[in-house]
């Protein structure tokens, strides 16, 4: 997205770990992590469906690991906060169906090449993946999605800390930011839907959410005193989670990425091991874009990588700095190929993606995060890129 002049509004949303689609993501990645903990070379494509009183796990898994799938499903549902049938699903008593097969040998033959050394692994599928970074926030994320995540993280913290007794697991946020060119200047509107128990008034919910959730989460300088608040705008939100809506793995791909700012290749992340470039190459694309911005080579940067199934090298690399680049985008493409490993095996090794680190990605977004597991958020290539770009510019 390029808009160097003029004012405009942009909106992004986030959802909590108790949202039915996010609960499904969390179950899928909990299974992935359990398998990787025992067998780092596990091949996993695990999909989850959750609805009233039922969780269904289906997909393709090839692994030497021996895990109790049903226990993982139940433990995950309870840990999120669904431990009472009155709120839609109880992990202790709900029905759990497991429908898992081995990975197709037709897919495996294109991926297995020299896997013992971790090199020359072919891509697990064709596809295109995007990464994005910008200077809106310290974590180099677009501000609307960053603020939406902060609000969700804060309401989740309030629920787990029992700051009030009426909060339930299913929560949503949405933030509209006004920009002047590429600069965020004010917050236009905030929407929060907070699932709650039956014995609380709308006024109490609204006051708590605005004063204790939203205001601590947004920059004071962007609050001009005229924010439009929409807190539980339907009036009540008692029925939620899998009881209110059926949840499926992979249905919150915009929440998982950049909130609609920049493009998306269409592939979901959760439940997939890192031979699936839908996940690993999207992480690498973010890593590349973030390092380009951190190096001062652009204010905004979108990177596209594209792959063919069974083929090691990407079929294309594309960069779009939205007119903010300090050197030509074509030169940045050359630097990317020189400084970043772009084969599936190289990505897996460099970002250490065979570790059981993925369940933490399922709430709060996959990008703009802290923590040891989020290796794709490092900016350890920035200095080398800046130096190489300087040499390129003077050559």
Curated annotation (Swiss-Prot):
**Binding annotation for ATP:** 19, 170-172, 236-237, 245, 251-252, 268, 272
State the residue spans of region: Flexible loop: 103-113
Q: What class of enzyme is it?
A: transferase
Looking at the UniProt record for this protein, which Gene Ontology cellular component terms does it annotate, in alphabetical order? cytosol
Keyword Membrane, does the record have it? no
Which subcellular locations apply to this protein?
Answer: Cytoplasm
Return the Pfam families for the record: S-AdoMet_synt_C, S-AdoMet_synt_M, S-AdoMet_synt_N
Q: Which cofactor does it need?
A: Mg(2+); K(+)
- The positions annotated for binding L-methionine are 60, 103, 245, 276
What pathway, per the record?
Amino-acid biosynthesis; S-adenosyl-L-methionine biosynthesis; S-adenosyl-L-methionine from L-methionine: step 1/1
Q: What are this entry's molecular-function GO terms?
A: ATP binding; magnesium ion binding; methionine adenosyltransferase activity
UniProt-listed Enzyme Commission number(s): 2.5.1.6
Coarse class of the protein's main subcellular location: cytoplasm
Q: Which domain of life is it from?
A: Bacteria
Instruction: List the catalytic activities from the record.
Output: L-methionine + ATP + H2O = S-adenosyl-L-methionine + phosphate + diphosphate
Annotated Mg(2+) binding lies at 21
GO BP terms: namely: one-carbon metabolic process; S-adenosylmethionine biosynthetic process
What are the alphabetically sorted keywords of the record?
ATP-binding, Cytoplasm, Magnesium, Metal-binding, Nucleotide-binding, One-carbon metabolism, Potassium, Transferase
Q: Is Metal-binding given among the entry's keywords?
A: yes
The record describes its quaternary structure and partners as: Homotetramer; dimer of dimers.
Write down the NCBIfam families for this protein, in alphabetical order: metK
Report the function annotation for this chain.
Catalyzes the formation of S-adenosylmethionine (AdoMet) from methionine and ATP. The overall synthetic reaction is composed of two sequential steps, AdoMet formation and the subsequent tripolyphosphate hydrolysis which occurs prior to release of AdoMet from the enzyme.
Query: Member of which family?
Result: Belongs to the AdoMet synthase family.
Identify this protein by name. S-adenosylmethionine synthase
What phylogenetic lineage does the species belong to? Bacteria, Pseudomonadati, Planctomycetota, Planctomycetia, Pirellulales
Name the encoding gene, please: metK
